[in-house]
Amino acid sequence: MIFSGLFDRHPKLKIACTEFDAGWLGVIVQQVDYQYGPKKAAHGNTVREDMKLELPPSEYFHRNLWFTFLDDRAAALTTPIFGEDNYMWSSDYPHAACTWPYSQQIVERTCQGIDPAVKRKLCRENVNKLYNLGLEFNCA
């Protein structure tokens, strides 16, 4: 989607990528700009005309793509690299792989040591923002 130019043509489009966890994002986002730019330049390669983007590839991850995770501590620990604005914890209820009835325990284990403000974003504020739910939270 990124290299097709979709997000250049539709900059406000937001896509939620669900049900495959997100601990891998830190590595991908870190590498995608390098693979697209400096590495190609170092080897004398240029970007194909049909793959030229208006922004660095990583910017589309932050602007257009949102990711969910269930029981994925690596995803929570990746927030310093990827950022905390496009991650969302998910229970996957009612599917067989869901975290219910242990969702609260899994969230606590997954987010152990994470700043409480980041945890709030991962567990409720980001989904509220993505879907424009307009919910107000009066709890810590």
Predicted regions and their residues:
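Histidine/acidic residue-rich metal-binding segments in metalloenzymes
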Residues: 1-59, 73-85
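Mid-to-C-terminal alpha-helical segments outside catalytic/metal-binding sites
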Residues: 4-5, 13, 23-24, 66, ...
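Aromatic- and acid-rich polysaccharide-binding/catalytic face
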Residues: 60, 64
